[in-house]
């Protein structure tokens, strides 16, 4: 039964209630399943957690009418959000915080139980394991529990597979494999017949799927399916082979074998080691192949491939691996195991994009990042430890999250996935993946200066993705996502520099499929620690909770604006709203309210002063007089009310208020930062000179971070200030239309400078300055990049979604 409440204010201190309907489909007790259960997939049933609310994301169109629709939408939603309803806000806030706490505990229990990867069982791999004869020669099955799993898990329609998603490739492969296993041991003929009937009734769907969804053909399907048919025919299982689809599969198989010659396969680890069971009828040199075996005894973590190898060799390491898997999964076998690196790095990515990673910083570092870095190599990353085959997808994800967290990873690893200007996931692959190129494109955006391989990869992946988007070819060979077209559209329209954290989260919460997302390997499978409704519902709660606080802060900003009579200086509340939005979309956490308001008020006052003195009537002499008056008042601690400059009174009053809220005496530091900015602004009236330093100092000081002399004189700090000021100056002028060869956002000089900033912020050293301090500068620069990148209509639409549209 769904937990339903109506409110926009979802945080504890609220005294007023605004009407926004939110439906959360996880009762509080269900999350506690995760909080108390330990030990992996056998104890944690994530599919009990369903998301009842499904909606189609709105298009991310750039504004086409100067932003008028966006302004009207902002005004309309503000009116809705300001409608008062009676009672219950505090009690509701307590309930929401309890739900958030339960969700956080649930996710933390997942981290506690992370082992070799939580993955669904594959009926196909289980069937191959069930085919293994007793190694001691009894004539019976080596793994009777695997046979029992097959008997127990046939679906009502006679097939085996995922009951919630139908793929002809997947269902037919799994069903035929299970029928072969049962038939080979002459048990349960009733289930065999029922399975065969399903197979024959649905074989025609394979041809249709081969036309409409060929991009989602299972990995190695053309190899393993044809081989399985040969095994079935030896057991006198009659398979209709009259469909043209079989001719296409044979052609695909021949192409794959041509790309990976047998000599190569015997000497170099390739993806074909994942499908050795597809080599029936092929003469294999097992002495050579066993030298390519992984340390755990598997063939690149594939139970089915390893089971086939055991049948051919009686290798004890193969046997040991399969015993481990069968015991772990109570008779079943997944399509790959272990998958612990894959799981860990994708979990971090999902939590970050959903905007909830801050709750798990310690767990992410100790459980995921340190582990992924430990297994990072010069060849990149694989999906599991000690696996001799590396892939571009896991390399991209590991590289990106490790670099963003300050780990030293080399971009040279990407050279192992490039040939003649083309980047590939696995060597000798026959088709390319759109999601792999999507992750490659995302990885290239955290490049440091001089990393030419990432420059090449970025151009390649961007061109590939643009072509796929233009052709509307979104089907992928590795995963079925709820809204990949939406994810791709956002990534192409808003590159990382121009993607504000809360904007990305607002869209991704709608794009993320929760436990409905399905992965594609040799069969379809689920990764419940990567895709689940616990993350989704926690992200919704968290977003709406933060948004409610942001709306209350926006009310205080409006009150400050009106009481200070700032409209008399030629600025509007729309400018105020944008200033607050840029701050809230960048620094969104509830506990950082002081920093957020300091950012917003500082930015708006800079804009107010700059705009006021843009007037031709206000000359350079007046700017000079204004600055001198400000210095006289704050340096001599004079009474501000005695000045004729109302703007100075407003500014100093605001700085005093920020000091009071901070709880530390930062007034002199704030005044000094403003004086420094004014001295750069005064000569030419250029408000963007020194803007990054003033904004960053205001934020950092309001957070309670005071600067020591060692910090201020540190070479990296001086470089950080200089580079950030330069970028914000160029980007600010670019937005205002003051274009020159240095201020165009597409100019390579800005791109190189952004790469330098990324390196300065994300490359750690033992004697470096505070990461929090560096991240503040980076957030400010990104906000300038975003504002220069987006047109007015786009910004208005984002303001609506981030500040006034609750997630449902």
UniProtKB/Swiss-Prot annotation:
Coiled coil start-end: 190-219
Tissue expression:
Expressed in stems, leaves and trichomes. Not detected in roots and seeds. Higher expression in young leaves than in fully expanded leaves.
**Protein's pathway:** Secondary metabolite biosynthesis; terpenoid biosynthesis
Q: Does the keyword Lipid biosynthesis apply?
A: no
GO cellular component entries: chloroplast
InterPro entries, alphabetically? Isoprenoid_synthase_dom_sf, Terpene_synth_N, Terpene_synth_N_sf, Terpene_synthase-like, Terpene_synthase_metal-bd, Terpenoid_cyclase/PrenylTrfase
- Key word Cell membrane present: no
Provide the residue positions that the database annotates as binding Mg(2+).
391, 393
Q: What is its EC number?
A: 4.2.1.133
**Cofactor (UniProt):** Mg(2+)
Chain positions recorded as substrate binding sites: 256, 477
Notes on the domains: The Asp-Xaa-Asp-Asp (DXDD) motif is important for the catalytic activity, presumably through binding to Mg(2+).
Q: Which family does it belong to?
A: Belongs to the terpene synthase family.
Q: What is this protein called?
A: Copal-8-ol diphosphate hydratase, chloroplastic
Q: Which organism is it from?
A: Cistus creticus subsp. creticus (Rock rose)
